Design a protein with these regions (language model features):
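A contiguous, basic/glycine-rich beta-loop/short-helix subdomain that forms a polymer-engagement track
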Residues: 323-348, 358-366, 459-541
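Conserved pre-motif I regulatory segment
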Residues: 167-210
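Metal-dependent nuclease catalytic cores that hydrolyze phosphodiester bonds in DNA/RNA
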Residues: 1-78, 99
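Walker A/P-loop NTP-binding motif
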Residues: 198-199, 218-233, 252-257
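Signature of the SF2 helicase/ATPase Hel1-core->accessory helical subdomain module
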Residues: 221, 248, 252, 328-347, ...
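Walker A/P-loop
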Residues: 202-224
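Mg2+/Mn2+-dependent nuclease catalytic core
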Residues: 54-148
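A substrate-engagement module of RecA-like helicase motors
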Residues: 173-176, 180, 233-348, 356, ...
Length: 541
C-alpha cells in the first residue's frame, strides 16, 4: 500500500471541528515563497525539500510511505529535521501543540533516522507569520526508539483501513476479470472506440475522440477503462463532465455493469453549495463552516472516520442521497465526507473543476507529481471555454470599498482596504474615459495590498464570528484569494482587462490560452481520453 506522510498522519490524528475561521486557505504559492526564503537563510548545512520514501512490512501488509521534508540541518552537534508552516495568526496564538504538524515532522524524522542509522536527532516546527515575516520555532529531541514507536502506532491505527482496502482490491479485480460488456451487442463504431480507449490507458497515452451522438460514449469509454483498471494499468478513474445529466448517465452505466457482477466503488461528487445541510430561511447555504454556525462542523473530525467506514460498507455506488443519509446519521459534514470517500473509491465522477480549477481541485490526489490515474473527459468541446473561466479572475474597487464602509470603525482591515482602494485608483494612470482597456502586463502593483487584505480578512473572520458584516467579508476574502491564485499563473497566455465605468474600476486577469495549464493538470495522471460528438476543427482542440 502506497500513501503519503500527510495522508497517513492527517487520517489517523485528525480530531475536533471544521472551522473555516481558523483556516489558512489556499495561500500555497505564497507559502512556498516563504518556505524558500526561510530555507535559504539556514546556510549550507541545511538541505531543503528532501524527498523521502520508506517501505516497511507491518503485520502482514507492505507500506510505502512517501513525503518531502522541508529541511534537514546537519551540524557537528547532530541532525535536525525541520517542518515549516505559514500562518496568518499572531505567533503568540501558536501553542506548538498541533498533533498533525508534529505527526508529519516525526514521520520525516523517523525516515531520516532509519536511512542514516541515527540513534537520536531533533525535530523542529517553524511557524512564520505571513504578514510580518516573524518566526517562532519549537524544538524537541527524540531517540530513534521513540520515533519508531510513534510510526508503528500510526500504522497500527491505519491497519484496519489497509486490510479493508487489500480485501476490496481482490474482490474488485475478480469481478472485473469476469465482467462482460453490459449489452447484448456493440453498436456500430462502439467496439472500435472501446478498443482505442483500452489501448490508451494501457499505453499511458492521450486520446482525442469524436463520436456521433447515440453511439453510447459513456459505456464505450467507461467499460474499457474499468477493464484496464482490473489489469493494473491504472489505479483510479476520474470521469469528468460539465453537465449534471451526464454525471447521472455515468452512474447509470456503473449500475448497468454492477448488474453484470461488477464491484467498483464509484462516487458522484456534489458541489458544496448543493450538498451542505446548513441553510438559511430562504434555503441558501449560510456558509458557516464552523462549530458555532453548523452542528455538523462541531466535532466532525472526531466522528468522520466512523462515518466513512460505515458508508464504504453500505454499498458500492455512492450517490448524493447515500452520502447525505450517512452524514446525517453520524452528524458530519456531507461535503467533507464525500471528499474523504474518494480516497477509497475506484471511480470518481464529477465536474471538470475537480481536476482543472486552481481553487477547488482535489488536492489529496493532484498535489503529488503524478498518480496512476486515468481521466475520462466527456463533452470535451466545452473544456476550452470552461478553462478560460477557471483560470481567470476579476475584482472591482467598489466591492472592496463597500466592505470598508460596512466595517465603520478604523482597524487593520479597513486600513488594508483603504490601501487597496488607492492602488485601484492608480491603475487609471491619468485615463479619465469610461472604457475597457487591454494590457499585456499584469497589474503587479495590486499584489502587495491584496496580500495584506487577505491576511487581515483571515484575522478579522477569526476574531469576529457572527458579525453582521461576516458574509460580505468572507465573500471578498474568497474573491481576493482567487485573484491572487490566478496572479501566480499569469504569463504570456494572459491579458489584463481594465474597465473604467461610473466611478468604478474592475480588473480582470483573463486567460486567453489555457492549453499549457490544462496540460499541466493532465500530467497529474497517466492517461486521458477526451470525447465528444463535436471536436471540429480538430487542430484547434
Amino acid at each position: 500500500m502506497r500513501l503519503s506522510v500527510r495522508e497517513l498522519v492527517e487520517f489517523v490524528l485528525r480530531d475536533g471541528d471544521i472551522d473555516n475561521r481558523n483556516a489558512d486557505p489556499e495561500r500555497m504559492a505564497e507559502g512556498s515563497r516563504i518556505h524558500r526564503r526561510i530555507q535559504r537563510e539556514q546556510g549550507d548545512c541545511y538541505e531543503a525539500e528532501v524527498s523521502l520514501s520508506l517501505t516497511v512490512d507491518y503485520e502482514g501488509i507492505t507500506y510505502t510511505v512517501e513525503g518531502r521534508a522541508d529541511g534537514i540541518l546537519t551540524t557537528g552537534e547532530g541532525v535536525l529535521v525541520d517542518e515549516i508552516k505559514t500562518t496568518a495568526l499572531p505567533l503568540e496564538e501558536i501553542d506548538g501543540e498541533n498533533r498533525v504538524h508534529w505527526g508529519q515532522v516525526l514521520c520525516y524524522a523517523y525516515m531520516v533516522a532509519r536511512q542514516r542509522s541515527l540513534p537520536r536527532l531533533e525535530v523542529q516546527l517553524t511557524y512564520c507569520r505571513r504578514e510580518t515575516g516573524e518566526i517562532r520555532r519549537f524544538v524537541r529531541p527524540y531517540a530513534f526508539e521513540q520515533l519508531e514507536t510513534f510510526f508503528q502506532d500510526l500504522l497500527f491505527q491505519y491497519r484496519m483501513w489497509a486490510e479493508m482496502q487489500e480485501e476490496w482490491d481482490g474482490i474488485r479485480d475478480a469481478s472485473i476479470r469476469d465482467l462482460p460488456f453490459p449489452f447484448s451487442s456493440y453498436r456500430p463504431g462502439q467496439r472500435q472506440l472501446a478498443a482505442a480507449v483500452y489501448r490508451t490507458v494501457r499505453d499511458e497515452g492521450r486520446l482525442l475522440c469524436q463520436a456521433p451522438t447515440g453511439i453510447g460514449k459513456t459505456i464505450s469509454t467507461l467499460y474499457p477503462a474499468v477493464k484496464a483498471l482490473g489489469e493494473g494499468y491504472t489505479e483510479k478513474l476520474f470521469y469528468l463532465t460539465a453537465k449534471t445529466i451526464t454525471r447521472q448517465a455515468t452512474m447509470d452505466a456503473c449500475e448497468k455493469m454492477a448488474a453484470q457482477g461488477l464491484r467498483l466503488r464509484t462516487i458522484v461528487l456534489t458541489a458544496k453549495d448543493k450538498i451542505c445541510f446548513c441553510r438559511d430561511a430562504d434555503g441558501n447555504r449560510n456558509g458557516e463552516c464552523n462549530p458555532d454556525g453548523c452542528p455538523y462542523a462541531k466535532g466532525h473530525f472526531s466522528r468522520v472516520n466512523d462515518a466513512l467506514y460505515d458508508l464504504l460498507g453500505r454499498c458500492d455506488l455512492y450517490s448524493r442521497a447515500a452520502v447525505e443519509a450517512c452524514a446525517r446519521e453520524h452528524r458530519v459534514c456531507p461535503f467533507e465526507l464525500q471528499l474523504d470517500a474518494t480516497l477509497w473509491c475506484d471511480c470518481i465522477v464529477g465536474d471538470y473543476n475537480y481536476l482543472f480549477d486552481p481553487q477547488v481541485y482535489l488536492r489529496r490526489f493532484f498535489d503529488i507529481p503524478q498518480g496512476a490515474y486515468t481521466f475520462l473527459i466527456d463533452e470535451a468541446h466545452n473544456l476550452g471555454d470552461r478553462a478560460r473561466e477557471m483560470y481567470s479572475a476579476s475584482l472591482s474597487k467598489s466591492t472592496a470599498w463597500a466592505v470598508k464602509k460596512a466595517l465603520h470603525k478604523k482597524e487593520a482591515l479597513t486600513r488594508a482596504l483603504a490601501a487597496l482602494n488607492k492602488a485601484f485608483l492608480a491603475l487609471r494612470e491619468g485615463d479619465t474615459e469610461e472604457r475597457t482597456v487591454t494590457r499585456e502586463a499584469a497589474a503587479d502593483t495590486l499584489l502587495s495590498p491584496l496580500n495584506q487584505v487577505a491576511d487581515e480578512t483571515a484575522l478579522w473572520l477569526k476574531t469576529h464570528p457572527g458579525a453582521p458584516e461576516e458574509d460580505a467579508v468572507l465573500s471578498l476574502y474568497f474573491d481576493v484569494l482567487r485573484y491572487l491564485k490566478v496572479a501566480e499563473l499569469y504569463d504570456g497566455h494572459y491579458r489584463t482587462l481594465l474597465t473604467f465605468a461610473k466611478g468604478d474600476i474592475t480588473i480582470r486577469q483573463f486567460c486567453v490560452d489555457p492549453s499549457a495549464l490544462l496540460s499541466g493538470c493532465l500530467s497529474k495522471g497517466r492517461s486521458a481520453v477526451f470525447f465528444s460528438a463535436t471536436l471540429t476543427p480538430l487542430p484547434y482542440y
